[in-house]
Amino acid sequence: IREAAEINRLCGEWNIDYSAYEGGIYSSEWFWAKALHVLREDEHVRAKAYSIVEYCEWLPALITGVTKSDDIVRSRCARGHKAMWHEQWGGLPSEEFLTTLDPLLAGFRSRLFEKTETADKPVGKLSPEWAERLGLTTEVVVAGGAFDCHMGAVGAGVTPHTFVWVIGTSTCDVMVATYEEIGHKLIKGICGQVDGSVIPGMVGLEAGQSGFGDIYAWFKRVLEFPLKEIVGKSDLLDEEMKERLVTEACNRIIPALTAEAEKIP
């Protein structure tokens, strides 16, 4: 959270607002905030770190046999939405911006990348090792990486003027727009508007809630606490009855609350 606050403050003071295409506000869950937090907190990682990679870039690189950081194909989706990458300012935020944010970031920009690719472009073919492990052939083409909700929108058949809601541990609201329609508009408060992050040749827009299913799971555990800790340890019932009662009650909590909530005018 501290790192994100520092990034937002510096974006507001700098001659270029690098958060402009990310809704005008940078999240603590995103690339630079996470990387800086790790560099500050972990001396061992700080001493050894050469570059920084997103998981959706690392996995395609791994299974295609890429072993050098410089050869990893970088994701337009990941970098545009989370790393403040944009062609308008030549890719990533400037070295001066990053080192002003924290000198610990010095040198990383030159060891990262300038270019990103959309997910429709193959990154290579399965390496012999992974072809054997997966029971496939080395002719299998591996697509570029992107975030799960963006690819969920592709799978749902997203088109302009449709809205795809991807619900899970978080909720992601995804749309696409033509260049002509979005023009020079900058939409405040969303998680980014990125050329080609969903469908190449269109601007992908993402919004949503970073916590959704996780919060429901936490809430359910809070409500279950007296059942498991009091009923589950009661001496008034035998073990089988306690287990059945606790399981039934836990399974009915959220549906029962939902039914009551639906009655509220």
Per-region residue spans from a language model:
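Glycine/Thr-rich phosphate-binding loops that ligate phosphate moieties of nucleotide
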Residues: I1-E13, E43-A47, G65-S69, A83, ...
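Conserved phosphate-binding catalytic cores of ATP/NTP-utilizing and phosphoryl-transfer enzymes
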Residues: R9, S127-L136, A146-T162
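Gly/Ser/Thr-rich active-site cleft segment
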Residues: W14-G144
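Short hydrophobic-aromatic micro-motifs
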Residues: Y26-S27, W165, D173, V203-A207
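Short glycine-aspartate micro-motif
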Residues: I52, E139-A146, G155, T162-V166, ...
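Short beta-strand scaffold segments in enzyme catalytic cores
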Residues: K82, M151-G155, T171-M175
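Short, well-structured active-site flanking segments
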Residues: V166-I167, T247
